UniProtKB/Swiss-Prot annotation:
HAMAP family: Thymidy_synth_bact. GO terms for biological process: dTMP biosynthetic process; dTTP biosynthetic process; methylation. It is an enzyme of class 2 (transferase). This is Thymidylate synthase. It comes from Yersinia enterocolitica serotype O:8 / biotype 1B (strain NCTC 13174 / 8081). Gene3D superfamilies: Thymidylate synthase/dCMP hydroxymethylase domain. Catalyzes the reductive methylation of 2'-deoxyuridine-5'-monophosphate (dUMP) to 2'-deoxythymidine-5'-monophosphate (dTMP) while utilizing 5,10-methylenetetrahydrofolate (mTHF) as the methyl donor and reductant in the reaction, yielding dihydrofolate (DHF) as a by-product. This enzymatic reaction provides an intracellular de novo source of dTMP, an essential precursor for DNA biosynthesis. The lineage of its organism: Bacteria, Pseudomonadati, Pseudomonadota, Gammaproteobacteria, Enterobacterales.
Amino acid sequence: MKQYLDLMKKVLEEGTTKDDRTGTGTLSIFGHQMRFNLQDGFPLVTTKRCHLRSIIHELLWFLNGDTNIGYLKENNVSIWDEWADENGDLGPVYGKQWRAWGAADGRQIDQLSKVVQQLKQDPNSRRIIVSAWNVGELDQMALAPCHAFFQFYVADGKLSCQLYQRSCDVFLGLPFNIASYALLVHMMAQQCDLAVGDFVWTGGDTHLYSNHIEQTHLQLSREPRALPKLIIKSKPASLFDYRFEDFEIEGYDPHPGIKAPIAI
């Protein structure tokens, strides 16, 4: 994960001091790209421990089209708690847009099902895209999509994916985002009988919060370790039938976790 550590250094060295929506303040750069060859290992940060259980459960929650934190709470995942209302609802966030995008004529479009169909029937298409940035529903969302738009690409029997993330919390959020989309590529590849290729991450406003600077320096003082391996223990009937128990990470030996406050 040298790419990730290099990004942290770049933000520290080149970032502009900016105010932000949360009132915390950031060091920010605009426009950055990283590429991870998923054949080389699962891109889970090793210079601090990442809570993989939360990453897996959140992705399964997205894939189910859910927008209430009930499932997450049942599985002791608290990453969305700060944004939910008193009933646990978040409005039409990722799961709703991925699985039931509302069209002007009243249809609900299951973008992920269409992607699976496209990858199987027309893998050379340049339109294999999922968007969470539904302009007509942004005001109803508890939090506008940060990882907003992603595209799949097939070449030489390998499935790659590029994500555009409009806003990126480099210290807390980005390790989750990288691992989550890498996991999605593995799942999608398995369903479509493809090997995994690259995960390409592209960031817009890419920032370190001012109250994460000390933690960032600590993380940069650590040597990265070998990447773990993802094992998917079974192949369910569809992309939407995976369970938490289907996944295993082998060889994950991270440095200790580093706590930092979340900006709301």
